[in-house]
Amino acid sequence: MMTFIPVFLFAAQKPVTEAAQGTFSGDYVIYRDYSWKAPTWIGFLYYNDETYGAFIHTQTPEKTSTVSILFSGKIEKGQLVLTGQQIISSITPDDTFGVNYLMSLLPKLYELKTLPRAGKAPFGTATVRKQMEEFGGAAALDFQSFIPLFHLKTITGANKETALELIEIGSINGNGESVFYGYSPAEPKQDENTFSFDKTAKKETINVSGISLHLDSQWTKIADNSFLCGNTAFLTVSTVNLPPAESGNQLSASERLIRLLTASSPYVKTLLPYTIAEGTPSAFTLTQSVYDIESKKISKDIKRCIKNKDGSFTIISLTVNSYAYSAAQAYFNGLF
Protein backbone atom coordinates (compact mmCIF):
# COMPACT_ATOMS: atom_id res chain seq x y z
CA MET A 1 0.00 0.00 0.00
CA MET A 2 1.31 3.44 -0.90
CA THR A 3 2.17 5.88 1.89
CA PHE A 4 1.66 9.60 1.36
CA ILE A 5 3.69 12.18 3.24
CA PRO A 6 1.71 15.41 3.75
CA VAL A 7 4.30 17.83 2.43
CA PHE A 8 1.86 20.38 1.01
CA LEU A 9 1.32 22.40 4.20
CA PHE A 10 4.96 23.20 4.82
CA ALA A 11 5.92 23.33 1.16
CA ALA A 12 3.41 26.06 0.39
CA GLN A 13 5.19 28.38 2.83
CA LYS A 14 8.37 28.43 0.76
CA PRO A 15 9.09 30.71 -2.24
CA VAL A 16 6.58 30.58 -5.10
CA THR A 17 7.55 32.53 -8.22
CA GLU A 18 5.86 30.48 -10.95
CA ALA A 19 2.64 32.52 -10.53
CA ALA A 20 3.97 34.91 -13.18
CA GLN A 21 3.43 32.07 -15.66
CA GLY A 22 0.18 30.82 -14.17
CA THR A 23 1.46 27.96 -12.02
CA PHE A 24 0.48 27.84 -8.35
CA SER A 25 1.31 25.69 -5.37
CA GLY A 26 -0.58 22.41 -5.75
CA ASP A 27 -0.84 22.41 -9.57
CA TYR A 28 0.07 19.20 -11.37
CA VAL A 29 0.43 17.72 -14.87
CA ILE A 30 0.24 14.06 -15.94
CA TYR A 31 1.62 12.70 -19.23
CA ARG A 32 1.45 9.42 -21.13
CA ASP A 33 5.06 8.56 -21.91
CA TYR A 34 5.30 6.52 -25.10
CA SER A 35 9.09 6.24 -24.94
CA TRP A 36 8.68 3.25 -22.63
CA LYS A 37 7.88 -0.22 -24.00
CA ALA A 38 5.27 -0.86 -21.29
CA PRO A 39 2.32 1.56 -20.90
CA THR A 40 3.74 4.33 -18.72
CA TRP A 41 2.47 7.60 -17.22
CA ILE A 42 4.53 10.27 -15.46
CA GLY A 43 3.39 13.21 -13.35
CA PHE A 44 4.90 16.37 -11.89
CA LEU A 45 3.48 18.40 -8.99
CA TYR A 46 4.57 21.94 -8.09
CA TYR A 47 4.69 22.75 -4.38
CA ASN A 48 7.05 25.73 -4.61
CA ASP A 49 10.35 26.76 -6.18
CA GLU A 50 12.22 24.35 -3.90
CA THR A 51 9.91 21.32 -3.84
CA TYR A 52 8.42 19.18 -6.61
CA GLY A 53 6.51 15.91 -6.45
CA ALA A 54 6.72 13.29 -9.19
CA PHE A 55 5.59 9.77 -9.99
CA ILE A 56 6.04 7.12 -12.65
CA HIS A 57 3.19 4.63 -13.16
CA THR A 58 3.90 1.55 -15.28
CA GLN A 59 1.63 -1.32 -16.28
CA THR A 60 2.98 -4.70 -17.39
CA PRO A 61 1.26 -8.08 -17.69
CA GLU A 62 3.01 -9.12 -14.50
CA LYS A 63 2.29 -6.09 -12.32
CA THR A 64 1.27 -2.45 -12.03
CA SER A 65 3.73 -0.25 -10.17
CA THR A 66 3.86 3.38 -9.08
CA VAL A 67 6.92 5.07 -7.63
CA SER A 68 6.44 8.49 -6.01
CA ILE A 69 9.23 10.93 -5.26
CA LEU A 70 9.79 14.32 -3.69
CA PHE A 71 12.52 16.41 -5.30
CA SER A 72 14.17 19.37 -3.60
CA GLY A 73 16.04 21.95 -5.61
CA LYS A 74 16.82 25.58 -6.28
CA ILE A 75 16.52 27.93 -9.24
CA GLU A 76 19.85 29.15 -10.63
CA LYS A 77 20.00 31.32 -13.76
CA GLY A 78 16.65 30.06 -14.99
CA GLN A 79 17.47 26.41 -14.42
CA LEU A 80 16.16 23.96 -11.82
CA VAL A 81 19.08 22.38 -9.99
CA LEU A 82 18.02 19.34 -7.97
CA THR A 83 19.66 19.05 -4.56
CA GLY A 84 17.93 16.01 -3.08
CA GLN A 85 15.21 13.40 -3.39
CA GLN A 86 12.98 11.36 -1.11
CA ILE A 87 11.11 8.23 -2.16
CA ILE A 88 7.61 8.40 -0.62
CA SER A 89 6.29 5.05 -1.88
CA SER A 90 7.37 1.45 -1.92
CA ILE A 91 10.18 0.73 -4.37
CA THR A 92 12.02 -2.27 -5.80
CA PRO A 93 15.42 -2.50 -7.51
CA ASP A 94 13.57 -2.65 -10.85
CA ASP A 95 12.23 0.87 -10.21
CA THR A 96 15.64 2.54 -9.98
CA PHE A 97 15.76 3.34 -13.70
CA GLY A 98 12.39 5.11 -13.48
CA VAL A 99 13.58 7.24 -10.57
CA ASN A 100 16.72 8.25 -12.45
CA TYR A 101 14.62 9.01 -15.54
CA LEU A 102 12.40 11.45 -13.63
CA MET A 103 15.43 13.00 -11.95
CA SER A 104 16.92 13.70 -15.39
CA LEU A 105 13.70 14.76 -17.12
CA LEU A 106 12.34 17.24 -14.55
CA PRO A 107 15.18 19.82 -14.82
CA LYS A 108 15.21 19.46 -18.60
CA LEU A 109 11.48 20.17 -18.95
CA TYR A 110 11.86 23.11 -16.58
CA GLU A 111 14.64 24.56 -18.73
CA LEU A 112 12.64 24.10 -21.95
CA LYS A 113 9.32 25.48 -20.66
CA THR A 114 7.79 28.14 -22.88
CA LEU A 115 4.83 30.41 -22.14
CA PRO A 116 3.23 31.39 -25.48
CA ARG A 117 1.00 34.46 -25.65
CA ALA A 118 -2.63 34.18 -26.70
CA GLY A 119 -3.04 36.98 -29.22
CA LYS A 120 -6.40 36.56 -30.96
CA ALA A 121 -6.89 32.93 -29.82
CA PRO A 122 -8.41 31.72 -26.51
CA PHE A 123 -4.93 30.62 -25.41
CA GLY A 124 -1.38 30.81 -26.70
CA THR A 125 0.41 28.07 -28.62
CA ALA A 126 4.01 27.60 -29.72
CA THR A 127 6.27 24.88 -31.12
CA VAL A 128 9.95 24.60 -30.19
CA ARG A 129 12.44 22.16 -31.71
CA LYS A 130 15.17 20.70 -29.50
CA GLN A 131 17.54 17.77 -29.31
CA MET A 132 16.20 15.32 -26.70
CA GLU A 133 17.94 11.96 -26.64
CA GLU A 134 15.20 10.57 -24.39
CA PHE A 135 12.85 10.86 -27.36
CA GLY A 136 15.12 9.81 -30.22
CA GLY A 137 17.03 13.02 -30.93
CA ALA A 138 15.37 15.90 -32.81
CA ALA A 139 12.04 16.56 -31.09
CA ALA A 140 9.19 19.04 -31.51
CA LEU A 141 7.68 20.40 -28.30
CA ASP A 142 4.17 21.87 -28.50
CA PHE A 143 3.22 24.35 -25.78
CA GLN A 144 -0.16 25.74 -24.69
CA SER A 145 -0.31 28.67 -22.29
CA PHE A 146 -3.11 27.46 -19.97
CA ILE A 147 -1.18 24.29 -19.01
CA PRO A 148 0.63 24.65 -15.65
CA LEU A 149 4.28 23.93 -14.85
CA PHE A 150 6.02 23.59 -18.24
CA HIS A 151 3.03 24.58 -20.45
CA LEU A 152 3.92 21.43 -22.41
CA LYS A 153 1.21 19.70 -24.45
CA THR A 154 3.13 17.10 -26.45
CA ILE A 155 6.58 16.04 -27.54
CA THR A 156 6.90 14.51 -30.98
CA GLY A 157 10.04 12.44 -31.46
CA ALA A 158 12.44 12.25 -34.37
CA ASN A 159 10.31 9.49 -35.92
CA LYS A 160 7.33 11.91 -36.06
CA GLU A 161 5.44 9.80 -33.51
CA THR A 162 4.07 11.16 -30.23
CA ALA A 163 6.59 10.51 -27.46
CA LEU A 164 4.98 12.42 -24.59
CA GLU A 165 1.34 13.52 -24.40
CA LEU A 166 -0.51 15.54 -21.77
CA ILE A 167 -3.32 13.47 -20.28
CA GLU A 168 -4.50 15.45 -17.27
CA ILE A 169 -4.03 18.67 -15.30
CA GLY A 170 -5.38 19.58 -11.89
CA SER A 171 -4.63 20.75 -8.38
CA ILE A 172 -4.31 18.98 -5.05
CA ASN A 173 -5.87 22.03 -3.36
CA GLY A 174 -9.18 20.84 -1.94
CA ASN A 175 -8.67 17.43 -3.52
CA GLY A 176 -5.82 15.98 -1.46
CA GLU A 177 -2.45 14.65 -2.59
CA SER A 178 -3.86 11.22 -3.48
CA VAL A 179 -5.52 12.72 -6.58
CA PHE A 180 -1.97 13.03 -7.91
CA TYR A 181 0.13 10.32 -6.26
CA GLY A 182 -2.73 7.79 -6.47
CA TYR A 183 -3.19 8.31 -10.20
CA SER A 184 -4.67 5.51 -12.30
CA PRO A 185 -5.47 5.80 -16.03
CA ALA A 186 -9.04 6.03 -17.27
CA GLU A 187 -10.53 2.64 -18.13
CA PRO A 188 -13.85 3.37 -19.89
CA LYS A 189 -16.37 0.58 -19.97
CA GLN A 190 -18.47 -0.21 -23.00
CA ASP A 191 -21.56 2.01 -23.19
CA GLU A 192 -24.43 2.32 -25.63
CA ASN A 193 -26.64 4.97 -27.18
CA THR A 194 -30.07 5.04 -25.54
CA PHE A 195 -31.11 8.31 -27.21
CA SER A 196 -33.69 8.17 -29.98
CA PHE A 197 -34.02 11.41 -31.94
CA ASP A 198 -37.69 12.33 -32.38
CA LYS A 199 -38.06 14.39 -35.56
CA THR A 200 -41.69 15.15 -34.65
CA ALA A 201 -40.84 16.68 -31.26
CA LYS A 202 -42.37 20.15 -30.86
CA LYS A 203 -39.66 22.79 -31.20
CA GLU A 204 -39.32 25.72 -28.82
CA THR A 205 -36.78 28.53 -28.46
CA ILE A 206 -36.12 29.53 -24.85
CA ASN A 207 -34.18 32.63 -23.77
CA VAL A 208 -31.94 32.31 -20.71
CA SER A 209 -29.76 35.28 -19.71
CA GLY A 210 -29.86 36.59 -23.27
CA ILE A 211 -28.94 33.21 -24.76
CA SER A 212 -31.34 31.50 -27.17
CA LEU A 213 -31.66 27.75 -26.64
CA HIS A 214 -33.28 25.82 -29.48
CA LEU A 215 -34.98 22.99 -27.60
CA ASP A 216 -37.96 20.72 -28.21
CA SER A 217 -40.42 18.60 -26.25
CA GLN A 218 -37.73 16.00 -25.53
CA TRP A 219 -36.26 18.43 -22.98
CA THR A 220 -37.56 19.00 -19.44
CA LYS A 221 -36.99 22.25 -17.58
CA ILE A 222 -35.63 21.49 -14.10
CA ALA A 223 -34.64 25.06 -13.14
CA ASP A 224 -34.80 28.52 -14.68
CA ASN A 225 -31.41 27.94 -16.32
CA SER A 226 -31.21 24.13 -16.60
CA PHE A 227 -32.76 21.47 -18.83
CA LEU A 228 -32.64 17.68 -18.97
CA CYS A 229 -33.07 15.34 -21.93
CA GLY A 230 -33.94 12.05 -20.27
CA ASN A 231 -30.81 10.21 -19.12
CA THR A 232 -28.90 11.42 -22.16
CA ALA A 233 -28.03 15.10 -21.81
CA PHE A 234 -27.94 18.07 -19.44
CA LEU A 235 -27.94 21.72 -20.58
CA THR A 236 -27.42 24.75 -18.38
CA VAL A 237 -26.60 28.46 -18.65
CA SER A 238 -24.60 30.16 -15.89
CA THR A 239 -22.49 33.23 -15.20
CA VAL A 240 -18.98 32.87 -13.79
CA ASN A 241 -17.03 35.65 -12.10
CA LEU A 242 -13.33 34.85 -12.22
CA PRO A 243 -11.36 35.89 -9.13
CA PRO A 244 -8.86 38.69 -9.75
CA ALA A 245 -5.60 37.53 -11.29
CA GLU A 246 -2.78 37.02 -8.82
CA SER A 247 -0.08 39.67 -8.79
CA GLY A 248 2.18 39.19 -11.80
CA ASN A 249 0.06 36.45 -13.38
CA GLN A 250 0.43 36.86 -17.16
CA LEU A 251 -2.49 34.59 -18.10
CA SER A 252 -5.49 36.30 -19.68
CA ALA A 253 -9.04 35.83 -18.39
CA SER A 254 -9.80 33.27 -21.11
CA GLU A 255 -6.63 31.31 -20.30
CA ARG A 256 -7.45 31.25 -16.59
CA LEU A 257 -11.02 30.13 -17.34
CA ILE A 258 -9.82 27.35 -19.65
CA ARG A 259 -7.46 26.18 -16.90
CA LEU A 260 -10.43 25.87 -14.53
CA LEU A 261 -12.68 24.14 -17.07
CA THR A 262 -10.08 21.57 -18.13
CA ALA A 263 -8.89 20.54 -14.66
CA SER A 264 -9.62 17.02 -13.45
CA SER A 265 -10.93 16.18 -9.97
CA PRO A 266 -11.24 13.07 -7.76
CA TYR A 267 -14.57 12.38 -9.48
CA VAL A 268 -14.08 13.34 -13.13
CA LYS A 269 -11.10 13.17 -15.46
CA THR A 270 -10.90 15.58 -18.38
CA LEU A 271 -9.24 13.64 -21.20
CA LEU A 272 -7.02 16.40 -22.54
CA PRO A 273 -5.87 14.69 -25.77
CA TYR A 274 -9.44 15.23 -27.01
CA THR A 275 -9.85 18.85 -25.84
CA ILE A 276 -10.44 21.49 -28.53
CA ALA A 277 -10.83 25.25 -27.98
CA GLU A 278 -12.00 27.43 -30.87
CA GLY A 279 -12.81 31.13 -31.07
CA THR A 280 -11.40 34.29 -29.54
CA PRO A 281 -10.53 35.32 -25.96
CA SER A 282 -13.98 36.95 -25.64
CA ALA A 283 -16.06 34.16 -27.21
CA PHE A 284 -14.85 30.58 -27.51
CA THR A 285 -16.15 27.02 -27.52
CA LEU A 286 -14.47 24.32 -25.46
CA THR A 287 -15.20 20.74 -26.56
CA GLN A 288 -14.01 17.94 -24.30
CA SER A 289 -14.37 14.28 -23.42
CA VAL A 290 -14.85 13.71 -19.69
CA TYR A 291 -14.54 10.41 -17.83
CA ASP A 292 -16.71 9.74 -14.78
CA ILE A 293 -14.55 7.77 -12.36
CA GLU A 294 -17.43 6.04 -10.57
CA SER A 295 -19.47 4.94 -13.60
CA LYS A 296 -16.43 4.62 -15.92
CA LYS A 297 -18.46 6.27 -18.67
CA ILE A 298 -17.35 9.01 -21.06
CA SER A 299 -19.47 12.04 -21.88
CA LYS A 300 -19.03 14.79 -24.44
CA ASP A 301 -18.83 18.17 -22.72
CA ILE A 302 -19.32 21.35 -24.78
CA LYS A 303 -19.03 24.81 -23.27
CA ARG A 304 -19.67 28.06 -25.11
CA CYS A 305 -17.99 30.85 -23.12
CA ILE A 306 -18.90 34.50 -23.77
CA LYS A 307 -17.15 37.34 -21.97
CA ASN A 308 -19.45 40.08 -20.65
CA LYS A 309 -18.70 43.79 -20.33
CA ASP A 310 -18.23 43.47 -16.56
CA GLY A 311 -15.52 40.83 -17.05
CA SER A 312 -17.69 37.85 -16.13
CA PHE A 313 -18.34 34.95 -18.50
CA THR A 314 -21.68 33.52 -19.54
CA ILE A 315 -21.23 29.78 -20.07
CA ILE A 316 -23.66 27.59 -21.98
CA SER A 317 -22.77 24.04 -20.97
CA LEU A 318 -23.96 20.81 -22.60
CA THR A 319 -23.02 17.40 -21.23
CA VAL A 320 -24.23 14.46 -23.30
CA ASN A 321 -23.63 10.72 -23.51
CA SER A 322 -20.73 10.31 -25.95
CA TYR A 323 -22.48 7.60 -27.97
CA ALA A 324 -25.64 9.69 -28.28
CA TYR A 325 -23.58 12.70 -29.35
CA SER A 326 -21.85 10.71 -32.08
CA ALA A 327 -25.21 9.42 -33.35
CA ALA A 328 -26.96 12.83 -33.36
CA GLN A 329 -24.13 15.37 -33.48
CA ALA A 330 -25.95 17.87 -35.70
CA TYR A 331 -28.94 17.88 -33.34
CA PHE A 332 -26.91 18.54 -30.19
CA ASN A 333 -24.68 21.12 -31.90
CA GLY A 334 -27.79 23.03 -32.95
CA LEU A 335 -29.12 23.53 -29.43
CA PHE A 336 -27.25 26.85 -28.99
Regions found by a protein language model. Give the residues of each.
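Bacterial N-terminal signal peptides
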Residues: M1-F8
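N-terminal targeting sequences that direct proteins away from the cytosol to non-cytosolic compartments
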Residues: F10-I30, Y181-F234, V268, K296-I298, ...
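Short, solvent-exposed secondary-structure boundary motifs
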Residues: A12, I30-A38, Y101-L109, Q131-F135, ...
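Acidic, serine/threonine-rich low-complexity disordered tracts
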Residues: Q13-F197, S326-A330
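Polar, glycosylation-prone regions of secreted, cell-surface, and some intracellular proteins
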Residues: I30, Y34, Y46-N48, H57-Q59, ...
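Short, flexible beta-strand-to-coil junctions
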Residues: D33-K37, H57-E62, G136, I155-E161, ...
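Conserved polar/disulfide-associated segments of primarily extracytoplasmic proteins
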Residues: I87-E111, D224-F313
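Short, well-structured beta-strand
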Residues: A138-D142, P148, K153-K160, S282-F336
